[in-house]
Amino acid sequence: MKSIVIAVTLVLFSFCFAFGETEAPTKDDAKALVKQAIAFVKQNGKEKFFDEVRNPNGKFHFKEGTKKGLYIFVYDEKGVVLAHGVRLELTGRNRWNDKDPDGKYWIRDWTDLVHKSGSGWIKYKEYNPADNNKIMNKWSYVELLDGMVIGCGIYE
């Protein structure tokens, strides 16, 4: 009887951990969010899109579940922030000359990428706002639409 109680307790305990954990967002999640953003801007226009990106309770912000931490960012082709889902203070700032801690011009890299192929993935280092602004590797999926570089990234 004692071993049955212990076994049941262990099973229940493992369920608590399983349901309490959330998986990190995936590259597929980030890419899907960019695709949703592109569909939204095509249907609603740039200004409504920018407002939705900046809205902390909008459809391009995930605060829980497996997509927790995902958000959209939008730049023009010269590195100016048009909308940012987390760092609203960046709006209007030109980040063309910003480098990551390794000296990589990541804005230039993703602009080159979207001009060559229309979309793709770039890896660089960036502050993670969901993890006390810790510098982490970040993979961002970016896509070009009407002079806008629309992206979403995941941290490693």
Regions from the PLM with identified roles:
Residues 7-16:
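Bacterial N-terminal signal peptides
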Residues 4, 18-156:
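N-terminal membrane-sensor/transducer module of prokaryotic signaling receptors
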